[in-house]
Every structure is written in structure tokens, then in C-alpha cells.
């Protein structure tokens, strides 16, 4: 047994390397800060220049006997181990030392970091722990989400993400061990823009139905001048942005791929429209590989390029991001082959995401999934996917996916379960086989207090509903078409109970904000002809404002959304707009 503190006093000190960088120093300071909060004991933070003592918590690669070997770790892996009375928290890179400190606080000392403002810090003046030897390593080298609150400065490392979000200054300025992109997607026009080139060089852009088009075009990827312009600008971008690890060369966010004879020939030879794309991106990537060996060139397997080419493999320094945008998200991705509205009209019959992922897995050295975890047309509508998150992340791992971007509502605080979903995603990116039910219960208890029980029952009610009726939903689903009217009284009863059980005003605010999802469903079933429509609408708008929700539809100014609510013109008001 290790006696870390006794009655608020401790013989331990925290040791870091003499030449520790900002993140390593910050890890040691955070550890001291939280141990003080837990026990009241102030542990000194020193460097390994001092002679060793028996009772030390060593953070980072300190010069001490017993230091674990991390040379075989990858993907920000780290080791937490006790050696007699000494504790080691050490990762295979600088950032993973910080992960080790936070994991020790969570897994050994019992802290929980639910959101940036909601934590559980146990109170123990006397703190004893059993000997331990733990190794943690994510199966994914890149882990990122856009859920609001998960990426706030200083919080994302507590959740183990490593996308290049804003970082608190005291975590260190170096971003060499995070995935920082230059251009995150739809970037081809950053290199060859039709506004600059089309008038003099229409041949640089897509031929569609026999003519070159400027509006909503793509690049002609077999044009040698387009390739040379792109290679030159790519090299300059890498020189100008040494802080970036990944440089995007990805199609624009629409169709209209080039049908010129040469592009058509290559795509036919490759059996997929990704043929021209991968050959083009490979040529760009190979042009910079010798000079910039640590740089990755990112591209998409998205919509018309989602199918893998039959002949050409992505170069070793090319990262392919396959996007699941067409899929159903109420069933495990491994099991459901249905394409959802509106993509059902543009999806090739017989072509499935599952097969495309497997095909890319066989040929790509770096395979990232861009996955979708919210309803982008209705941020306030329930996204009934909590029960499939683990299945999906296991599916990605089992298909040799090397990175995950789990896109959510990144524009506003959630009126649904954004905080819970972001928390679960962060845990699953490190432990796909972990205990999701335990994590869910811990989060609900920490975030909603005594109201956790009925809220948990509500989550299970929705999951059971979609399973019982085999309901499918994509990322633009209408809540009117998706959830049955008979469910609403049961929903309301559970949220009434949750509000009645709320511990205090702060908890009540969280409960009422999360209840907006049910109120939105009920409102969406009304029409301007209903007697109480105006009153219900204005009260809902007032409460949306009061709870700090600033977007309820992706990319649309909330005042425009409110006007649509008032006039009964929200998208999906007519069930004919949706297929399910």
C-alpha cells in the first residue's frame, strides 16, 4: 500500500525532468493542484536534479531508477506504475505525459472530468493506493471531435484528444505532437481557384456533360498544369506553416467531378472516381516526401470518391479520410447498409460504406474516419445513437482505422446530450472495449446529480424505441417522421421527474436545457393553425435563449431559425421532405 497522504500531510514530492518542456511542467503542476484539492496536502514540484528520495511521483522521463521503458508505445501511449514507494507517470512523447497525469487522477485517485466546468474531485485527507502497473494506448493515432465544450482550451487533453484545438498557454506552445491541419476539408480551391483561373484556363476545371463549368466545379485532376500549380503551392504552404502536420488536398463539397476523356479513362481503369483523385494526390505527396518526411497529405473518400480505386494505392504519406455521411446512425454501422435522405438519391445501388471501408483499409497506410454524431438540420432533436457509439468505434478499430474525427454540434451548447456524447466518444477512442454503461452512469450522476435516474431511463426508452420498431435515421432526419407520438407522454413524465429531483438551481438548469430536445419534438408536431402555437413558440424561443443555445440548425443564424419557427417553415415540417 502506498500512503500518498496522511491527515492532509504528505512525504511525497512531484519530480519532473530538469529540461521538461511546457507540457511536462504543466502535467506536474496539474497533478500537484488536484492532489491539493483532494487531500489538502501541497506536494512540492521539483526537478530530477535533486537527489532521489523514496517517496516520489515522477512525471515524464526523469533520471530515476525503475523508469518504465516507453519505447514500444505509440499513439500517445503511457505507463502508470508504482515501484515500491515511487510512482512513475511517463508517456512516449511530451503530450502523453500530460495524459498520464490526468489518467492517474481519474483511474487511480478517482477524479472525473466531465466537462470544463463539471468535475468530480473526491475529498480524502488520507489517501492510500494499492500498487499498480497500468499501460494505456489508444488504437488511434488521431482523435478529435467537434462537440462544443470538448475542445475548449485546457480541457481537450483531459479527455485525451489530440486535434489542434486552442490550448491554454501554460500547457506549452509546441504543437509538434498534435494533429494540426492546414485546411480541414474541401480545399482544392485553395490551390487552383476558378475565380482566379477559369476565364483563361477553363480546362483546369470539370467537364460536365461536355462543357467546362465554373459554378460548383471540381478540378480536372489529369491536367498537368493543375498538378504543377498545386505541387508548387503545397510546398510553399508547408514552408510557411511548420506548425502543421497535415495538409489537405480534398474535393469541394458537391459533385460535378470531371468527365473529360482523360479523367473518364483513369476512373474507368480504377473502377472508381477516386482513381483520378488518388493519382493526383499521390503525385503531390511524392513531390514533397523527401524534403518533408513527417508531413501527411490528407484527402477524402467522400460521396463520389468513397469507393477505393482498384489499382492505385495511396502513397505512404497520404492520409485518406473516409466519410460516413450517407449512413444510418441508429443502427451499428457494421450492420446497417441503408443510405439515408438525401443521399439515397445519389448513392450507387449495391455500394456500401462497410465494403468501401474494408477496401480502403487494405490499401491505405493512414485511414481516418470522418463520422457524424448529431442531427445537423435539427441540433435540438434527439440523436438516438448513444447505444451504437461503441459498436461503431470497435468497427473502425477492427478495420485498421488510424484516426477518428467524430463531428458533432460544435457551434453551440447542447440542448440535447452533447456533453454526454462527447465524453463517451473521448473514452471510447482510448478504450473501445470499455464499460460504456459504467461511464454513462458516472457522467449522468456527475452532471445531473439526483436527476440522473429518470434521464438514464429516458435514454434507454429512446434506444429501445428505435430498436423495437427498427427505425433508421441519418444526419438530417425530421423528428416528426422519426419518433412516434405515443412516446411523448412517457418522455414528459421522465423529464418531469428529473426536474423534481434536481439538487439545486445549477443542476435544474442543466436538466431543463437538456429537456429542450423533447420540447422541440412536441413543437415540431404543431402548426401555425393550432390555438396555442404562438404562445408555445415564443416560450420555447425564450427558453432557448435563456439556456445559452446559439444555434439550432447547422450554419444558420438563430434569428432566422426563430423566424422559421414562428412561421411554421422549419425544414421537415412536411413529412414528404423525408424518407425513413
What are these model-predicted stretches?
Residues 44-71:
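Short, well-ordered secondary-structure micro-motifs within conserved domains or adaptor modules
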Residues 267-287, 314-334, 396, 424-434:
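Acidic, His- and aromatic-enriched active-site or binding-groove loops in soluble protein domains
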Residues 262-274, 334-347:
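Glycine-rich tight-turn/loop motif centered on a GG-T
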Residues 371, 425-580:
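Catalytic domains of carbohydrate-active enzymes that cleave complex glycans
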Residues 225-228, 236, 341-451, 457:
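Structured mid-domain segments that build the active-site/substrate or prosthetic-cofactor binding neighborhood
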Residues 37-50, 295:
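Short, well-structured beta-strand/strand-turn elements
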Residues 7-11, 15, 19-22, 26-30, ...:
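Feature activates predominantly on carbohydrate-active enzymes
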Residues 298-332, 380-388, 413-422:
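Substrate-binding cleft/loops of secretory-pathway carbohydrate-active enzymes
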